[in-house]
Design a protein with these regions (language model features):
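Catalytic core of membrane glycerolipid acyltransferases/transacylases, capturing the structured
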Residues: 1-58, 87-92
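Non-catalytic C-terminal accessory region of glycerolipid acyltransferases
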Residues: 21-25, 48-49, 60-204
Length: 204
């Protein structure tokens, strides 16, 4: 599999549709939004485009299922990861502030011993009636060569892809439509602590 870290920018559905139309398989994870009927419509749309979707609820982990679904297959695994919903997020430098992002892409690449790429999707040639979608992809990203012995590789790899994404996103920040709180200073520390405790309880 090709593991790809994405942020909530541009139209990843259009990008995914293009990939599927050109004969490549996609397996990805989608958050279970409310009401369930809305989530079902999102899944139907993406499956209709040729993608395989694994649903995940807040506080839930589908990492094991994802590993088994993609291991040994020739698939692209794009994962939206600039926001953590699992309660096991990694704190990174995003621009000039600390943010909490998902461990998924780095953890999957490490687990499968596969390279990690990062993509930034933006709009180009915008008109009142539409726009083109531009996908920029870099990688494989790597951990620093001077990574200390015993340091957490997943954390280092996560910081590496976030830094690449932030650099690309700086050209079109208006296309980053993150409508949730991701910066640590904006998060409720008590709620975050509860989410982490619940994640640990479920994954003992």
């Amino acid at each position: 599999p090709v593991v790809l870290a994405l942020g909530h920018s541009g139209s990843w559905d259009r990008a995914g549709a293009w990939v599927c139309a050109h004969g490549r398989a996609i397996v990805t994870v989608a958050e279970k939004v409310e009401p369930p009927s809305l989530f079902e419509r999102f899944v139907a749309l993406r499956e209709g485009l040729g993608m395989e979707i694994i649903g995940v609820a807040k506080g839930e982990s589908v990492f094991g299922s994802l590993v088994e679904r993609v291991r040994g297959r020739s698939v692209i695994v794009p994962l939206l990861a600039d926001r953590d919903i699992s309660g096991s997020g990694i704190e990174v430098d995003l621009g000039r502030a600390r943010a909490l992002v998902a461990a998924g892409p780095a953890a999957l690449a490490t687990k499968l011993d596969r390279p990690l790429f990062v993509a930034c999707i933006t709009y180009e040639n915008e008109t009142p009636t539409g726009a083109d979608v531009r996908v920029r992809c870099v990688g494989p990203v790597s951990v620093p060569k001077d990574l200390a012995p015993g340091a957490n590789r997943v954390e280092a790899l996560t910081q590496a892809w976030v830094s690449e994404f932030a650099a690309m996103m700086a050209d079109k920040p208006q296309d980053w439509h993150m409508m949730q709180r991701v910066f640590v200073e904006d998060l409720d520390p008590e709620r975050l602590a509860r989410a982490r405790a619940e994640h640990e309880r479920k994954n003992r």
